C-alpha cells in the first residue's frame, strides 16, 4: 500500500517487460512530493521447460504461462501502480502465440490491479531518445539515469541477457509517467484522506 506523509505519498510501482521466454520486472518507489523515482528491485523470470518430444507444444506453452504468472504474482501484490511494455503482434505463428499469451497475462494483471498503465515498445524507445534504440542503448540510459538500480550482474558485470528485460521495465515506468493516466492516478492518491 501507498505510504502517506500528509498529502504526499510514496507509491509502489511494479513494471513489466513480458515475453514467453523472459519476464523482466522492476520495482520502484515514486515520491509524489519530489517526483523522484527510486528503483528498488530488478528481476527476470525465465521459464524452465524440459525439452521432451513427448510433451505437446501447447502443454509447454501452458507451463511457461503458469511460471510467468506465478513469478509475477507476489511482486504484484503490494504494488499501487503496475505498468507494462505491451508487446506488438508479429508475422510468424509462433511469435503470435507468444504475443497472445503475454497479452492474456497482462490482461489478468490489469483485472487484479486496476491502476494498470500500458505503454508501447515505441514509447519505451522514444523515452530513451531514439525510436531505433538498441538493447545496449536502453541499458546505458538506465545506468545513467539510475546508477544504483540493482540490474542483474554476472561476475561483477551487467548480465545483458537478463538486464535488457529489467532495463526495458525501468524505462517503461518513465514512459508510463508521461501518460495522462499516470497523472490521474497520482491525483487520486493525493485526494485520498
PLM region descriptions:
Residues 2-193:
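Phosphate- and other anionic-substrate recognition elements at nucleic-acid/protein interfaces
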Amino acid at each position: 500500500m501507498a505510504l502517506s506523509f500528509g498529502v504526499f505519498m510514496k507509491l509502489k510501482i511494479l513494471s513489466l517487460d513480458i515475453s514467453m521466454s523472459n519476464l523482466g520486472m522492476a520495482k520502484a518507489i515514486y515520491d509524489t512530493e519530489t517526483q523522484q523515482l527510486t528503483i528498488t528491485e530488478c528481476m527476470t523470470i525465465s521459464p524452465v521447460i524440459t525439452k521432451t518430444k513427448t510433451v505437446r507444444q501447447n502443454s509447454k506453452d501452458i507451463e511457461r504461462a503458469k511460471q510467468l504468472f506465478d513469478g509475477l504474482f507476489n511482486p504484484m501484490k503490494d504494488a499501487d501502480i503496475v505498468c507494462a511494455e505491451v508487446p506488438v503482434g508479429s508475422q510468424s505463428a509462433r511469435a503470435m502465440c507468444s504475443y497472445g499469451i503475454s497479452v492474456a497475462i497482462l490482461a489478468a494483471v490489469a483485472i487484479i490491479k486496476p491502476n494498470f498503465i500500458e505503454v508501447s515498445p515505441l514509447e519505451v524507445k522514444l523515452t530513451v531518445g531514439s525510436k531505433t534504440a538498441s538493447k545496449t542503448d536502453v541499458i546505458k540510459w538506465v545506468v545513467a539515469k539510475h546508477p544504483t538500480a540493482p540490474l542483474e550482474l554476472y561476475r561483477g558485470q551487467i548480465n545483458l541477457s537478463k538486464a535488457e528485460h529489467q532495463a526495458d521495465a525501468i524505462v517503461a515506468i518513465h514512459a508510463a509517467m508521461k501518460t495522462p493516466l499516470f497523472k490521474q492516478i497520482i491525483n487520486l492518491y493525493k485526494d485520498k484522506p
